[in-house]
């Protein structure tokens, strides 16, 4: 008897790396049940759109993706952050099959089952232990918790994803171990608030291999560093205990890289943001961090044009950047977000002023980045290869996260492979990227 064709699903994943991990988990479950992935909407039986709802611009992108799926297919399931407040989706597209919020994996699967029942195939390949990944094979995002306990005035993430819920340390480490066994060379540790990991569990111990490991930021980072892959820490809130992890970086256990969204430098703006406001103390910490680990690369994000931001406060931000010498920077022009407390603040900044300040911030950062990268000319850097061609390759140093940071462009006298780790001599630098030659050949 001929086997019925497997039902096909097209998948759209929008938003941050945390949402990408949610997409990977849904796809892994669906593939385990026999569903196949289609490359195009019109070749699928159904479309799933994992939305982003953090900013109004992200909501518009999500609505556009839903509209495209409706036009090309007509059978659409919506999930993700925007689904937590479904009214806007329902108003625009009343005929979508289902709308669910973030992390509601079972609800998504139930919606798929209702619209497109699975066909059992006893000859299906078993799922790989690491699950289905949407990233290239050599790196993977490792999500260690959901939600956030902070209440920044501009942010609605706690409303969308709830309070902090950490995974047991052993569970995280088992997943990381499977990823490394499958060939992953770089683990990108992500969450809404990575350095708060384990607070909700009261740092409870769990058994991994032959020992107990505490659900604590430092302990988890140390154990991840023992697996033999690059470990990159992202979305770190600047709590005092972050200082402890710098020692691990100095020893080479985890990458000398910290992604800390400082958001601003003027204490008055930070107070309105409901963020830590003692940036003078932060400068002293950054100095100590670099004394302990001279190779430390700092990435951060900042918001310009926050309600009430004066010219003096913006000037404080520029001056602080010069002193802190942030290596990598992302900047956002403040957007009111439905449900955010900052919407009620007085003195909203005109759009043209936000643009001027954004331009000035990025111009200042370009000079800082160029200055810091120039210091690497003549040094040797370890590089992971992301793209390879017949005469060279594009990769990243330990100071560069995928998708958001710079690149290292390499020439080589031998073919290079994606995922390969090589040592490169840096020949020159520009504002954001390095250029070099693979050493030893």
Curated annotation (Swiss-Prot):
Its cofactor is [4Fe-4S] cluster. [4Fe-4S] cluster 2 binds at residues 148, 152, 155. Keywords: 4Fe-4S, Cytoplasm, Iron, Iron-sulfur, Metal-binding, S-adenosyl-L-methionine, Transferase. GO terms for molecular function: 4 iron, 4 sulfur cluster binding; aspartic acid methylthiotransferase activity; metal ion binding; protein methylthiotransferase activity. Residues 134-371 form the Radical SAM core domain. GO terms for cellular component: cytosol. It is an enzyme of class 2 (transferase). InterPro entries: Elp3/MiaA/NifB-like_rSAM (IPR006638), Methylthiotransferase (IPR005839), Methylthiotransferase_CS (IPR020612), Methylthiotransferase_N (IPR013848), Methylthiotransferase_N_sf (IPR038135), NA-bd_OB-fold (IPR012340), Ribosomal_uS12_MeSTrfase_RimO (IPR005840), rSAM (IPR007197). SMART domains: Elp3. Binds 2 [4Fe-4S] clusters. One cluster is coordinated with 3 cysteines and an exchangeable S-adenosyl-L-methionine. GO terms for biological process: tRNA modification. The keyword Ion transport does not apply. Residues 7-117 form the MTTase N-terminal domain. The keyword Transit peptide does not apply. It is found in: Cytoplasm. [4Fe-4S] cluster 1 binds at residues 16, 52, 81. It catalyses: L-aspartate(89)-[ribosomal protein uS12]-hydrogen + (sulfur carrier)-SH + AH2 + 2 S-adenosyl-L-methionine = 3-methylsulfanyl-L-aspartate(89)-[ribosomal protein uS12]-hydrogen + (sulfur carrier)-H + 5'-deoxyadenosine + L-methionine + A + S-adenosyl-L-homocysteine + 2 H(+). Residues 374-440 form the TRAM domain. HAMAP family: MTTase_RimO. Catalyzes the methylthiolation of an aspartic acid residue of ribosomal protein uS12. This is Ribosomal protein uS12 methylthiotransferase RimO.
